């Protein structure tokens, strides 16, 4: 052993069992030396030819290893060693600079070198492991493996290199950039094998590129004219073809192997020579990106995938030949132009049960027909149809003999799988017999994924189901029918069979029964005539199914009686909906229910849905910006933004026309609602029956000159418990209506945190309130209104509530002006109350009326033995005309009033009271301070009470009210 030698030891030939440790200068090791270990040598050792079993550890400069040396390890050498010709079994570990490997070297491992070694011609069986940049592989190098390359460089294949396997993974700067054929400009981003280099090698030899751990991506176009083959493999990572590959040679081949991940073809592949072959192998299958195609146009072309051979279809005659083996495997090798020729459906009366892969190619300009019940390119599909484009396919079912004809461009019936099929410029028309029409398929009992269809569909009076993608999507005992990642764009017109109540027409699907529709949408137009139709921008009729992440931008128009029309679904029964959007206009005449999203929704929950188109219904029953009629369907996170207009209707709402037994959470409507003669109209809900709304808002104008109940949020409400509601639009009603800034007519329920800020206008005989027009036996807590309230000849008008019966108000306020020159009961808070309880309330707006009225700064008229005011105040001026009861707090009262005050001016030519004009109840612990301004001589007026027929105690007057008698006239009962 030599330890800590400043100058390197010279070890003679034949020496054995010697260790050199910490030698500043490297030792010279002679030929034939065996079993010597050199440790921590600053300069690299010179190892003679034939030396064996020697280990050099931590040498700053690389060792020079002579020819024929074997079994030698060089560890942590800063500079790469030079390895002579014929050296065998040498391992280079952690060398900063790459080793130079001589010709004929075999079995060498280079591990973790910062720069790549140069492999001389004839190097065989070598492995380069975890190198930072890629090697230059010389001509004639064979079976060379490059493993775990960390950053970019060039694998330069010599003119005669054969069967070179390139294993390149783990790009340090970007691990998602795997090895493969990349654009030369990306050389610094990851391991790169240049396309031009590879093409030169393909001209003379077969080439295989393998990624053992990382990704393999083809990033640039590659073409070759020879008959050689290219094999690309990603054993664990992604294999993606991003650049076009083209081979024109006879018998050329392309093999793509993706071991553990799907094979992704993002650019076109074209092998046009005779006998050319393509093979795909992947445990997870392969997928073609939109617009990508694989061309196999040469004679005797072949295709194989995962061990299965496919027949290549290249013309109509071969397409027709599928009838001879309906269970076979087929690919479409190139575009087929049909020349508008008639084509009998594949299978006709029999089902296709094999696989047909279009490889992204197109079948164009065919008139397909069937002689039985089915008309389509395929009559019935039980197998797999994928990666196919259809253009200018027409069908009408006219030659079918069955009484019920199903017509689609791709297939009449699908019981199998359809994937990545696109049909454009499709023309489907109805036959003169019972029929269903689909842009892609008529009846789907299987699965459709990543499909699209566009064109025209024309129904007639015999058409019972009609859909842009599928007429019907129906689950059976065999399994769930599904449509996903699919779209349709059709102009749908004509007629639909009358009163086909369990069918319908939709932009995507006519009828969905138990099926699933996900991540799909439709656009275009749908305009049909017929009675009792179910029309939807996406689905006409859906029952017991599910829809998620769906949308429709279809203008829907129906002409007929008793129809159900929706921007998304016409009739929805027990079909849950999540993440849905509709943006088309929806119009109808004399329909049963019409909605921007759904016409009628029964027992179906909806979450995260919106509608953004204008809706209109000239006559009918239910009209809603989102849903016309909602029965027992709970909604969450729903909204609308379109305008709504209608004629003589029962219920109309900016969100829902009629909502029954359903809760709404986070619901909003933006847009104007205008009807003529409707029963109930609201900015959010037309009528609500026993439903609850939490966090609801509306911000548009609500108008109906002859409607019965109008509310800025809800027209008519029965029951339910609402909270956090607000409305901000102007509400304008005509005669004999209940109209409120938030609710027109409210009966029952416990409601809290309600607010309205818009102005409210009513007509003769109306009950008008800034918040609620008429409130019956309902509890309202923490409620407010700030808009001005006006009418002409109303029955009751109030800044908060027009008329209240047996209601309870707590923490209530109003701030708007109340005005009706010909009304009957006017109040700053409540116009008229009967057995009403008011606690902790205030009103600050002025109240003004005409002759013969009851007017109060808080309540115009409050009657009933249960009527109560506790802790309330009024600050607005109150004025009225002759023969009126005019009070700073209450005009006419039989109630108990305690802890109340009034500070506004009280004036007019009627009975005046600073607090109460006419008291038949009990006033105690209350006060008044406002000025009294009588208009005629001997007019009765009092600073606290004008005329007292009841009781009063512990009351006071001050300020201007103290300058007149506290009680104008007192009568003992």
Provide a role label for each language-model segment.
Residues 2-201, 206, 260:
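Long, low-complexity repeat tracts used as extracellular stalks/passenger repeats
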Residues 102, 125-973:
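Surface-exposed repetitive/solenoidal architectures
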